[in-house]
C-alpha cells in the first residue's frame, strides 16, 4: 500500500489493497 508505484496505488485500492 506504500511500497507500490504511484500508478498502481490507485488500482491497489480495488485490486488487492
From Swiss-Prot:
Q: Does the keyword Secreted apply?
A: yes
Q: Report the SS bond pairs.
A: 12-17
What tissues harbor this protein?
Expressed by the skin glands.
In terms of domain of life, where is this protein from? Eukaryota
User: Cellular location of this protein?
Assistant: Secreted
The GO cellular component terms are: extracellular region
Family (UniProt): Belongs to the frog skin active peptide (FSAP) family. Ranatuerin subfamily.
Protein name, entry field: Ranatuerin-2R
Amino acid at each position: 500500500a506504500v511500497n507500490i508505484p504511484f500508478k498502481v496505488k490507485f488500482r491497489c485500492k480495488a485490486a488487492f489493497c
